[in-house]
Amino acid sequence: MLASGLPRVKAEPNDLGARLDCLLGAWLSTGPLASGVPMGASHGIGYVLGAEFGVPHGHTSCIMLPAVMRWNKPANEHRQALISTAMLQSGSDAGDTLDRLIGGLGMPRSLSAVKIGREHFQRIAVQAMATPWVPRNPRPIESPDQLREILELAR
């Protein structure tokens, strides 16, 4: 619902059907979060980007989620295929599909877009390792080096 509704609202802000799709999509997305579905590296890194660099939460998700999905793909390729299908892009890479959606909405898609360079990656990685979300990532993250790999994907 969000994958189709958000671009329609961007193109035509007064489209009430598109707005309803976005409302319902947002509401449905809260169910898994409320029932305890764990968040992973995207939220762990995003927490640091917000706390240390003032990047808004919505922007951190737009920047980090496609990169984290690409990094996680070896661990959850089947689940990512379901995401691509739900976004009406069956057979496409889920990280790429999400990145195209984000780009089409005019949201930031890279760390450089929010003025965060490589010189900060080590500090971000070390701090993100201490969050409660990184240990719950679908593909285990055992060191800041692995988080720096993800940050490079988002550069």
Show the residue positions of the predicted features.
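Active-site segments that bind and position negatively charged phosphate/pyrophosphate groups
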Residues: M1-T97
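C-terminal charged capping/lid subdomain of soluble metabolic enzymes
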Residues: Q89-R155
